[in-house]
Design a protein with these regions (language model features):
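Conserved small/polar residues in nucleotide/adenosyl-binding loops
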Residues: 227-229
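Two-metal-ion acidic nuclease core segments, chiefly of the RNase H-like superfamily
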Residues: 79-97
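Active-site-proximal acidic segments at structured loop/helix or strand boundaries
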Residues: 115-214
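RNase H-like two-metal-ion nuclease catalytic core shared by retroviral integrases
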Residues: 65, 76-77, 97-119, 135
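Mobile-element integrase/transposase regions
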Residues: 1-32, 40-44, 178-195
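Acidic/histidine-rich, metal-coordinating catalytic segments
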Residues: 59-78
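Active-site beta-loop-alpha junctions of metal-dependent nucleic acid enzymes
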Residues: 34-62, 83
Length: 229
């Protein structure tokens, strides 16, 4: 499976804003998966991979990506060292992370073509949506529609070949890995916790207590031991 980030501009609730479509494409069937996020951060990257695996119905043997900092700790290409969270994710799902060499777009040409396809077919003219969920529903609809397409030099439609390709995918683990980014702030005197540059209010009775904050792409959860605040 090849994966990559794109960039797009939309109107969200009447306001013009930039979003980041995550694109994934299987190599045999050319089946696409696309989901948009506000940011290209680690939480979004791992959440998108989880959703792509679920959408395709199995785990590919390899995930081919570039040398973006969300995935690579050091080095590049064959010498790249994966970020700890990404390495843990790959181990959980049982795939090999493969990193492209610099300036070698041909190594993930399938997904780069998908980025362009989404830009031309979904983002022109600029989409007007009320929420990111509405945009992602449109993206999934486009992915489903593409399965009726037949790629040049392929013997069958994308959907038919995806059915065949699923037989070669690994089974999805029964346990879904928690891909949130963790923080461990103490509740301050004003009953707030600080996560990066943001403050979040909690009930006054939790002042001085240690919490676990789980940051997901579009929301956070604050936990005190096993209690979800």
């Amino acid at each position: 499976m090849q994966v990559d980030w794109g960039e797009a501009v939309i109107y969200l609730g009447g306001q013009r804003m930039a979003v980041n479509p995550f694109c994934a494409r299987l190599c045999f069937s050319c089946a696409p998966f696309v989901i948009a996020y506000e940011r290209q951060n680690l939480e979004s990257f791992l959440d998108a991979l989880t959703r792509a695996i679920q959408f395709f119905g199995g785990v590919p043997r390899q995930v081919i990506f570039d040398n973006a900092r969300v995935a690579v700790k050091s080095g590049f290409g064959a010498h790249a060292v994966a970020q700890e969270d990404y390495a843990q994710f790959a181990a959980h799902y049982g795939f090999e992370p493969v990193f492209c060499n610099p300036a070698s777009g041909n190594e993930k040409g399938l997904v780069e073509n998908l980025v362009g396809y989404i830009r031309r077919n979904v983002c022109v003219p600029l989409p007007r949506v009320r929420s990111l969920e509405e945009l992602n529903a449109k993206l999934l609809e486009q992915c489903a529609k593409y399965q009726t397409h037949r790629v040049d030099n392929k013997p069958a439609s994308v959907g038919e070949m995806l059915t065949e390709e699923r037989q070669a995918l690994h089974a999805i683990p029964r346990y879904t890995l928690d891909t949130s980014k963790k923080f461990y702030p103490t509740v301050g005197r004003y009953a707030t916790v600080i996560v990066e540059t943001n403050q979040y209010s909690v009930p006054c009775g939790y002042r001085g207590q240690s919490t676990t904050v789980k940051a997901y792409p579009n929301h956070i959860e604050i936990w005190l031991s096993l209690i979800h605040i």
